[in-house]
Amino acid sequence: MVKYDNQKQLKCSFCGKTQDQVKRLVAGPGVYICDECIELCQEIINEEFEEDIDMGIGELPKPKEIKEFLDQYVIGQEKAKKALAVAVYNHYKRINSRIKPDDVELQKSNILLLGPTGSGKTLLAQTLAKLLNVPFAIADATSLTEAGYVGEDVENILLKLIQAADYDIEKAEKGIIYIDEIDKIARKSENPSITRDVSGEGVQQALLKILEGTIANVPPQGGRKHPHQEFIQIDTTNILFICGGAFEGIEKIIESRIGKKSLGFGAEVQSRKEKDLSEILSHIMPQDLLKFGMIPEFIGRVPIVVTLDPLSKDDLVRILTEPKNALTKQYEKLFELDGVKLEFDKKALGLIADMALERKTGARGLRAILEEIMLDVMYEIPSSDNIEKCIITEETVLKKAPPTLVYSDAQKAKKKIKKTESVS
């Protein structure tokens, strides 16, 4: 505070009020500012800061726009993309709305993605976070255990999100967390057991509070909580949780519920092999998840259940070529950096898709297959001169012949890469 000077009446350089008209007058090099102007400046800064952090309703993409963005990265799964687009739009619309205390309360709706391995569950969640420009974290449910046992506490999931937000808690509180392998924490048996299920039902119980919305205490360095430790507090009310799992065998539970009950002559019998798996999964109900081993309280906190279809051969071929970051486009870019144009024969792409289906790894297995095929090619080409084009054929995929090379000489002679001796 500036002391009163009888020689000169000090006044605020901004509003012009004298020292005796205000409570405080702060002095700087040749200037003064009063407490009223400081308060006004603080209000202006706070308003601008809130506008920067809050995603306005006008800026929030509409469900159709969200689906169009997902289409650029995720092939197929039309029903799942539509359901996710609506769910995510409603979630962030709820966050951005300024609801009065006496108004209708909009509850959070977390999402459960259910589908085979490699069908695009993780990619869908990652792509949503990319579009919305919010912090995103992936957690593995299999590493979680109930508090007090060896393994990770559920609060460590939140630490990953805080780290993704560069420890900006306000930003993290509007993020997305994808919990993978959620089916692995199913109750080990349908009936409650005397022995404690610390990595199954116990984890489900521990997740309930953060899924619903609570002020969680997170250890800054991760690991177990202990007394006299400082914690980071984070409100999970507006964090969107997307849980994903393959739920292998749940189709049998659904079938037993919707299947025909009649027996004897004339009974209508239809085996699961004759039914389409995606059609069976589309009939999933909460009681099926309950019978699988998920507890009722957990099911209630993930009300939106989205099923993903198994990927067909055509889907896998499209995944190889169509998305913005398609695998073939990535390899083409790598070869382009060496001045070589890379092409994949249509039959070769079909064969790669067949191999992925045979391995039952879905889209996730495509990269491993391509790495095996491309190893010798990527080893030889950087050392070869004057190569203009490299064509991956069906024979190359089967490892019966090297790829076709087009050289940039006058004759455009086609040559073959000599097979490198394989070490058995």
Swiss-Prot record:
It comes from the Bacteria. One of its GO terms (biological process) is cell division. Keywords: ATP-binding, Chaperone, Metal-binding, Nucleotide-binding, Zinc. Gene3D superfamilies: 1.10.8.60, ClpX chaperone, C4-type zinc finger domain, P-loop containing nucleotide triphosphate hydrolases. ATP binds at P116, T117, G118, S119, G120, K121, T122, L123. Disulfide bonds: none annotated. The keyword ATP-binding applies. Zn(2+) binds at C12, C15, C34, C37. Residues 1-53 form the ClpX-type ZB domain. The keyword Hydrolase does not apply. GO terms for cellular component: HslUV protease complex. One of its GO terms (molecular function) is ATP-dependent protein folding chaperone. Pfam families: AAA_2 (PF07724), ClpB_D2-small (PF10431), zf-C4_ClpX (PF06689). Component of the ClpX-ClpP complex. Forms a hexameric ring that, in the presence of ATP, binds to fourteen ClpP subunits assembled into a disk-like structure with a central cavity, resembling the structure of eukaryotic proteasomes. NCBIfam families: clpX (TIGR00382), PRK05342.1 (NF003745). ATP-dependent specificity component of the Clp protease. It directs the protease to specific substrates. Can perform chaperone functions in the absence of ClpP. Belongs to the ClpX chaperone family. This is ATP-dependent Clp protease ATP-binding subunit ClpX. It comes from Thermoanaerobacter sp. (strain X514).
